[in-house]
Amino acid sequence: ASDVYKRQNEIMFPAAILQPPFFNPQADDAANYGGIGAVIGHEIGHGFDDQGSQYDGDGALRDWWTAEDKANFKKRTTALIEQYNAFVPSQLAEKYADDPSKAPHVNGALTIGENIGDLGGVNIALKAYAFALDKAAGRPEDGSPEAIEASLATAPVMDGFTGLQRFFLSYASIWRSKNRDELAEQFLQIDPHSPAECRTNGIVRNVDLFYKAFDVHEGDTMWLAPEARVAIW
């Protein structure tokens, strides 16, 4: 599996990950940026999560943040923790449908580092995809939100899906999984990663471009009010 090594200040990806659903040399950029791109971004994000942020650029454990930065980081991560604390995996919600009070929830504090990585990874990959479109069109890179959105809008439509839609569909596809109920409950207790569906739905609902991609509005299942959406970086 891919990983980040804080003391060495490096990230690692085994060659075996460079295959579908993460990467396909025959696929278009949207699919690959939504797949391996988000994974690469995830590992970069670990450098600035609740643990990685304690190490400096040389891999030394050092307090290098300002008090203001720490306070803002704490505020944003707390909001993300609270979001995930409210999640119950759908298979367990179904299992405990007769008594929802017994349904186990995601542990937002346990999974915060991985959730920060996932959220950062998607946003990094979206920006990288936009820059790839800019390069192909001979446009200068512009990292502003407005320019990113404009660049992504130039992606070709394929099989009836826009570039943005293909990006998010690819991201969702890399987390497809199926577990027994017993294992799903065990993972909630010990795994620092959120359940696969939460790594998908819990993340994209915080990304403004997801709403534009699928025309999500208030009242839709995936809707999260703009003021409640979290952006760590």
Summary of predicted features, one role per range:
Residues 39, 43, 47:
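Catalytic glutamate of the conserved HExxH
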Residues 2-35, 47-233:
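Zinc-dependent metallohydrolase catalytic domains
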